[in-house]
Amino acid sequence: MLAMNDLKFFYENSPEFMGFIPRKRGIDSPKTIIYGVLNSGKSAVLKNEISELKKDEILYLNLADLRLEEAVANDAIFAARNSAGDTKASEINEHEISREATLDAEISDTGQFYRAAVKNDTKIIKNASLNYINNAKNAESGGIKNRSENFFREIKEFLAANEQISSLFLDNFSSADFEISSLQSFAGGLNLKRFIISTRDKELVLPGFERLELLPLSFEEFIAFDKRHNEINSMISAFLAQGGGAKNPFIAPAEILEFEQSLLTANFSRTEILILKECLSFVHAAFSANKIYTALKPRIKISKDAVYGTIAKLERENFIRFLSKVGEPARAKKLYFSHFNMREILTSKKDFSKKFANVLFCELLGLNTSIFYTKELDFYLPALKMGVLIIPFSDADIIFLKFRKILSALKRLDVTSLKVVSMANSGRLEIEGIRCDVLPFHEFALSF
């Protein structure tokens, strides 16, 4: 059981954090859940809140901290987590490596995943993720719910005994280690000025809490973070090479690949990484989980359940995203990675067109509006009446010919602004109230 002395240690040794670089999105509510993919900067945003408070007013707990794991070892909250015979994994949060093993358990709800396979319906995969996680938890030894309740009860008693603490920060919360229902009960019974939680779980919701999705660095944010380049072309090259990981600008370029690979091996099993590699084939293309299963089956022992469960996990933890065709939610969705440099991390092969499309998708996510694809458009943002085409190397005159060909489709979609993203070309043409702007990447990325 977590002892008072253990909590006292963490209370007296809160993290020191300086030099925070503001992000486009920040905390606006005293009760906030920060969620996002690995290496998106969640811990940094959370710790920046701490830096503005008096030390005796805060309790900060990194739930992936090895020292905290030792403190709760008797309750075995972190025990019995395996990754299908792989060695224990360790979590790397935004500023340090801390253990968080992955779980690769058999899934009992085969029927639901099989129906998803037949229909190739990523919506069903998403709905099945809850069953995947719940069944994985059932494979663990002991009652995680009781251990979670004991853990949060100890924190509550410590807060009651130290009334000067008005702010609680829980970093790296994982539903693989703690019951969400226990966290909900715990949060509902507290009277704090601030309660901030960070997690990779996009489905974590608590009554009275605002939710802040933190994305990897946009190009604009990368420029603010990276101080090694001062010319726009070198900035673009560095961004495309290093990716949008929040810690990457502070790592020597030669060490970024090793760091990124360490993130993966620390948080995913060998089987999950193989599934990730297969996902690369579907970037900016119609996704099929069944094709991934078919590709892997001759090479490794794997079930459809494991494939669909892993896809559900990757989506829930914001590692992959799916893009629907407008007006046709049942159609196959396109896949994108939250970290657009995943191909270089996982393979020696390059595909600039797919990577560039993924880069632009990540930039558009920052607009916080619905995105779709259509037959004519790579990306369609109906709320902004905007369409986006990716044509990196064609001259403006050739692009304008395509603009004329799809003009009727743009009218039907009520698009008034067509953005054509290029690597270097530029130009503008307006026809019948619809404006086509050919923009170099940096102008497009910095225009929002």
Where are these regions (language model features)?
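Interdomain motor-coupling "hinge/lid" segment immediately C-terminal to the ATP-binding subdomain
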Residues: 199-285
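Walker A/P-loop nucleotide-binding motif
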Residues: 30-45
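Conserved P-loop NTPase "ATPase switch" module shared by AAA+ and STAND
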Residues: 158-179
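N-terminal pre-Walker A segment at the start of P-loop NTPase domains
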Residues: 1-25
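A cross-kingdom feature that marks ATP-driven nucleic-acid transaction machinery
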Residues: 2-6, 38, 326, 333-448
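Short glycine-rich substrate-engagement loop in P-loop NTPases that contacts/grips substrate
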Residues: 61-81, 118-121, 125-159
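Structural recognition of the conserved hydrophobic beta-strand(s) that form the central parallel beta-sheet
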Residues: 171, 192-200
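Accessory nucleic acid-recognition modules appended to NTPase machines
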Residues: 259-382
